[in-house]
């Protein structure tokens, strides 16, 4: 399931503490501290204009990953990013979470389109999006991440 992240949740995660009523993955981190700090900044920036902007991915009361709106939405389009702890990959957690995010988006009148990008080598992430009805719309080269595949799913 996805649960909206609030600033105190990020504060807890940055301290290595489980937020609210969930447990931390014990055998691997959901994200390195620098990634958590970056996601916290993104959530604050995006959240000033659009909320919710970040969610915990929770399975069996354990926070296994995160999903975020990573750019300020424009014209009904939200751009998402997501990740799951390495020890919880390959179990369908991300596929279920992105499916739930799409249900939320389709019930939010502010959202008409959800976009995401995956590395060309990240087959697992590509499958997550395909299983949730995303359509490959092109490719681009990112200065930091290299070749990326661009995806979109209608939210109306």
Region locations from a protein language model:
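Proline- and acidic/polar-enriched loop/turn elements at helix boundaries
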Residues: 100, 117-118, 141
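Conserved acetyl-CoA-binding loop-helix of GNAT-fold acetyltransferases
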Residues: 82-84, 90-105, 127-131
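Conserved GNAT acetyl-CoA-binding A-motif
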Residues: 107-117
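A local structural micro-motif
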Residues: 96, 113-114, 137
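Residues that form or flank phosphate/diphosphate-binding pockets in enzymes
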Residues: 92, 124, 146
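GNAT-family acyltransferases
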Residues: 1-79, 85-87, 104, 108, ...
